[in-house]
A protein has these predicted regions:
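Short, low-complexity, Pro/Ser/Thr/Gly-rich segments in the mature regions of secreted, periplasmic
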Residues: 185-199
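Short secondary-structure boundary motifs at beta->alpha junctions and helix caps
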Residues: 123-188
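Sec-dependent N-terminal signal peptides
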Residues: 2-14
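Residues that line or immediately flank small-molecule/substrate-binding pockets and catalytic motifs
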Residues: 17, 104-107, 162
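Boundary at the C-terminal end of the N-terminal hydrophobic targeting segment
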Residues: 19-23
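Outer-membrane beta-barrel translocator domains and adjoining extracellular loop/strand segments
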Residues: 114-119
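Short catalytic/ligand-binding loop motif for oxyanion handling, primarily in non-cytosolic enzymes
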Residues: 109-112, 164-165
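N-terminal segment of the mature soluble domain
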Residues: 25, 31-32, 36-109, 149, ...
Length: 199
């Protein structure tokens, strides 16, 4: 009786394994980062984006290998090259990834008038000079685009940003937190595309 149970269990587990193995694994690779931040900081954000995609269930290919491939292909590029796909897509095909992700990280400061405090002081008749109501805001934004390697088409894009007053205690969202926000946005479109291809 126990042997029968073991045999049935083994067959059941084997069938489940075969069923799940039919679902192909989706792999993506992030392109070299772009934006207004220092390269070291941008790289930290790209690593966070990769981590967020991995947590969402996708495989993440070696970014440094992709960068090397792109550089090699750029150096070999000649005037008679077939331009049906650009270098990045060719590199993606060489790496056998399904998607390429471009990550742009921008950081900037801007001055804004604190209208809330100004209106409050006006009501109390203690209005100060306009310059005293100027606040400096720091903003960081991640913008990502997901390109399907097979078709060279943009299938998803999204952005997430955080802004803080520089003189106050609240700090900007961490790279991980901001990356999760933007990846959650684009995963909906990626899942739709995967479902469409499998049907």
């Amino acid at each position: 009786m126990f042997k029968k149970f073991l045999i049935i269990s083994f067959i059941f587990i084997a069938n489940i394994s075969l069923m799940y193995s039919k679902e192909e694994t989706i792999t993506l690779a992030c392109l070299p980062p772009e934006g207004t931040m220092e390269l070291k900081e941008m790289t930290s954000y790209v690593s966070s984006v990769e981590g967020a995609f991995f947590k969402a269930g996708l495989n993440v290919a070696d970014r440094k290998r992709l960068e090397r491939l792109i550089k090699d292909m750029e150096s070999q590029e000649s005037s008679d090259t077939d331009y049906e796909t650009d270098i990045t897509v060719k590199a993606g095909k060489a790496m056998k990834v399904d998607y390429l992700v471009s990550v742009v990280v921008d950081n900037w400061e801007e001055e804004k008038i604190d209208t809330f405090s100004m209106n409050r002081d006006r009501k109390k008749d203690v209005l100060k000079l306009k310059e005293e109501y100027i606040l400096t805001y720091e903003t960081t934004r991640i913008n990502i685009k997901v390109i399907e390697v097979e078709t060279s088409m943009l299938i998803a894009q999204g952005s997430a940003e955080d802004s803080v007053v520089k003189t106050r205690f609240r700090k900007l969202d961490t790279p991980d937190k901001l990356a999760k926000k933007v990846v959650d946005k684009v995963m909906k479109d990626i899942k739709k595309q995967i479902k469409k291809k499998r049907n």
